[in-house]
Each structure stands twice: as structure tokens, then as C-alpha cells.
């Protein structure tokens, strides 16, 4: 019986140490702050949000010092995800102001973060609801066209400021929208020809 207790204690201790170790290894990338760098520039470089970068480094202000080492949180947004987002932004927000492009990219990220939608960029963009794709450019093939540089920049900005918007999960053009359901959503902001809603 004593042997069983010792084995149980050793096993529990080993598991707790292993669990702690895997938790601390979750964010192992670091960045040495250079003169003139900001949270936004660093977050943009690594494809993480400013909020997450500040949170993991216990920072509440925007103050950074050259030579300071920051821990970079892991991100689930790959380069392929960014490219896919940029192509969707380019197709959905063609002719819209830059702020509208950022807002479209933010809707994608908000959906990824919402329990009501798929939890990946690809899953959100290619989601089908009642037999229809959620985004028209997926349905009509415009998603396959290359993204313009402004749309790529808009995606980077949306990633850097992830979680700081108004929580929009939808957007639509009221002149072309045919769904009464979308028109019933609470509008958070209007940018260009698009209304963004929850």
C-alpha cells in the first residue's frame, strides 16, 4: 500500500511538472525591442494582436524601452490565412475606403473568435449556411483573384488590433442586401457602402 501511495505521488508530481512545463513553452518566441519600435510594429511583424502582446508581457501602457525583451504569443493565423483573408477583403471591399477593408478583415477575425462560427480563417471564409457560402466572392470565384497591397495591409492592421473593434460579425451593402435577417442585425458602424453589424 505504501508503494502504491509513493507511486501515485510521484506520478502526480510528474504530471503537474509536465503540465507546467508545457504551459510555459506555449509562448517561447521572444523579441528584443529596438529603438523606435512600437507595440503595433512588433505585433504586425509577428501577426499577433497588440492586446495579446501586451497581455502576455503584463503591459498596460504603450511604453517600450530599447533592449527590452518581449515574449511573442503563439498565433494561429498563418501566412496562408493572411493571404486568403486579403483575397476576400480585396473582393468584398473593392472600391471601399481603407477603414472598410480593415473592418471586413476584422469581421473574419471576430468570427474566428466567436463560438457561433468555425474557429479557423479558412473555416470562416468557406463556411456554408443553408447551402450557400457566407461570402459572395467564394460563391462567384472572385476569392481566387490576387489581393491588392492595400487589402494585405488592412489584414495586417486588423490582426494587430484584433479584439479592439466593436465586435461586428457581419457586414452588408444595404443597397444590394436581399435578406431581411441581415437587415435586422444591430448596426455597429457604417463605412463607405457597408454596414457592419452584430
Label the model's feature ranges.
Residues 39, 53-54:
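Conserved hydrophobic/aromatic packing and binding residues within compact polymer-binding modules
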Residues 1-26:
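Sec-dependent N-terminal signal peptides of Gram-positive bacterial secreted proteins and lipoproteins
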Residues 79-198:
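Bacterial extracytoplasmic/cell-wall-associated proteins, especially those involved in peptidoglycan
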Residues 2, 40-43, 113, 193:
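Core subunits and conserved enzymes of cellular information-processing
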Residues 21-47:
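Primarily a LysM-type cell-wall glycan-binding module
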Residues 15-17, 26-30, 69-83:
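Intrinsically disordered, low-complexity Ser/Thr-rich linker and spacer segments
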Residues 55-59:
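Short alpha-helix capping/helix-loop boundary micro-motifs
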Amino acid at each position: 500500500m505504501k508503494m502504491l501511495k509513493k507511486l501515485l505521488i510521484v506520478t502526480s508530481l510528474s504530471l503537474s511538472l509536465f503540465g507546467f512545463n508545457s504551459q510555459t513553452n506555449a509562448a517561447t518566441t521572444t523579441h528584443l525591442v529596438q529603438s523606435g519600435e512600437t507595440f503595433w510594429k512588433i505585433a504586425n511583424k509577428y501577426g499577433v494582436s497588440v492586446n495579446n502582446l501586451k497581455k502576455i508581457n503584463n503591459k498596460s501602457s504603450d511604453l517600450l524601452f530599447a533592449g527590452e525583451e518581449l515574449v511573442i504569443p503563439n498565433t494561429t493565423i498563418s501566412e496562408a490565412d493572411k493571404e486568403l483573408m486579403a483575397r476576400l477583403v480585396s473582393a468584398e471591399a473593392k472600391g471601399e475606403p481603407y477603414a472598410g477593408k480593415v473592418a471586413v478583415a476584422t469581421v473574419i477575425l471576430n468570427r474566428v473568435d466567436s463560438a457561433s462560427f468555425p474557429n479557423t480563417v479558412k473555416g470562416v471564409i468557406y463556411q456554408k449556411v443553408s447551402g450557400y457560402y457566407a461570402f459572395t466572392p467564394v460563391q462567384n470565384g472572385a476569392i481566387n483573384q490576387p489581393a491588392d497591397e492595400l487589402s494585405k495591409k488592412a489584414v495586417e492592421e486588423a490582426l494587430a488590433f484584433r479584439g479592439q473593434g466593436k465586435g461586428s460579425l457581419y457586414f452588408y451593402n444595404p443597397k444590394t442586401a436581399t435578406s431581411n435577417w441581415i437587415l435586422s442585425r444591430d448596426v455597429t458602424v457604417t463605412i463607405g457602402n457597408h454596414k457592419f453589424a452584430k
